UniProtKB/Swiss-Prot annotation:
Main location: membrane
Organism: Polaromonas naphthalenivorans (strain CJ2)
Keyword list, A-Z: ATP synthesis, ATP-binding, Cell inner membrane, Cell membrane, CF(1), Hydrogen ion transport, Ion transport, Membrane, Nucleotide-binding, Translocase, Transport
InterPro entries: AAA+_ATPase (IPR003593), Alt_ATPase_F1_bsu (IPR017691), ATP-synt_VA_C (IPR055190), ATP_synth_F1_bsu (IPR005722), ATPase_a/bsu_AS (IPR020003), ATPase_alpha/beta_chains (IPR050053), ATPase_F1/V1/A1_a/bsu_N (IPR004100), ATPase_F1/V1/A1_a/bsu_N_sf (IPR036121)
Cysteines joined through disulfide linkages: none
UniProt-annotated location(s): Cell inner membrane
Cross-referenced Gene3D superfamilies: 2.40.10.170, Bovine Mitochondrial F1-atpase, Atp Synthase Beta Chain, Chain D, domain 3, P-loop containing nucleotide triphosphate hydrolases
Catalytic activity reported: ATP + H2O + 4 H(+)(in) = ADP + phosphate + 5 H(+)(out)
GO molecular function, one term: ATP binding
Protein name as annotated: ATP synthase subunit beta 2
Amino acid sequence: MTDGGLQADAPHLGVVVSVRGSVVDVRFDTHLPPIHTVLHADEGRIIVEVLAQRDAHHVRAIALTPTQGLARGMPVVDTGGPLKAPVGKGILSRMFDVFGNTIDRLPAPPDIQWRSVHRAPPALARRSTRSEVFVTGIKVIDVLLPLERGGKAGLFGGAGVGKTVLLTEMIHNMVGHQEGISIFCGIGERCREGEELYRDMKDAGVLPSMVMVFGQMNEPPGSRFRVGHAALTMAEYFRDDEHRDVLLLIDNIFRFIQAGSEVSGLMGQMPSRLGYQPTMGTELSGLEERIANTDSGAITSIQAVYVPADDFTDPAAVHTFSHLSASIVLSRKRASEGLFPAIDPLQSSSKMATPGIVGERHYALAQEIRRTLAQYAQLKDIIAMLGLEQLSPQDRNVVGRARRLERFLTQPFFTTEQFTNLPGKLVSLEDALDGCERILRDEFKDCPESALYMIGKIDEARARKTEAIDVHES
């Protein structure tokens, strides 16, 4: 590696004494490197990070690069410092790996500094305690699950329910319609998705306000374990030095926990429940607590959380839940019904949905919507057995409102225009609340449910109904 972040000032030499997969034991006769020090072998092509000092002369390190070609007896150089990430205005619009090397086939950015990826969370006195709503332009989130500026939201779901699509739409809305920086951190996900995201953001013209950092699934566990810290270091620079608001999107936080589990197993630690590392809570807290709202700016984080086998009692999901101000659960059933985004409003929750923060009108509307959807969920079994006709008129009205609300809360995304042939829609909070309120007042009782599906503002439903009548008459 040739970047300035990993050069040694006064190298201390060690020698490899053991290689077991990604775990490397190194002997130093004079100076034992501290924990988190980066070591180079094979002329800098193999990079490892010290995780344990075994005795007065031996350290155990985890490889951040593949260890092919590494052998006992090879010399190892102590760089004298930790893993570092590039920061500065020059990193905008660029794509990096965990070492700060550019991976977008463009020259290295000028005017950058290098900072350690191991940084303490902001002090309690510096944290801001104001509760502000972060508007996304996505109806179902802004109305029922308002996100917190400087908070953490999790997108929980199994494979293929739309977590990555929802993340990319939020990037589009944040960069295109708000003055902020977006940092996308890909942890252990598919290389294809990263490349597609880069091209999509470039085509959308939002790349100048973005930074992308990737440690993909083909890379060693050490690399996937550290890439989240590298992305956070960049986010902290824009918050603290540039006084900008940052949207940090992590896809996927489960892969960070999974990489930590692999590292823990390789280091010989006793596994905990379901094979997870015993230090999972500490490792996750070390990452999550750095995401904070301070007096100089805010880092708002939205994290995709893969749920193994859709089991929400999995320790990885349980530990992640405890750090979040909003939990957005994506439902496979809703996805199969074509209700996108496939967010389950009854399973999802937000700490911001209180009258003191969002206001009395918004809170009352959100509660009424939840109540209507919950009543519909209870009536579904009766409808399946006896049919809609067997319900009382009052219950039939509830079902009609709930079905129209479900369809109104769907939304065409900018990032899926090429697949759906529907133009993307950004909906203001006021328009979304107005639409839900009018549906609950039965203003659209005569409107077919299909007219409310995949629209932006509620008035588009009337236009669709008129178009349908004109087509039918002609």
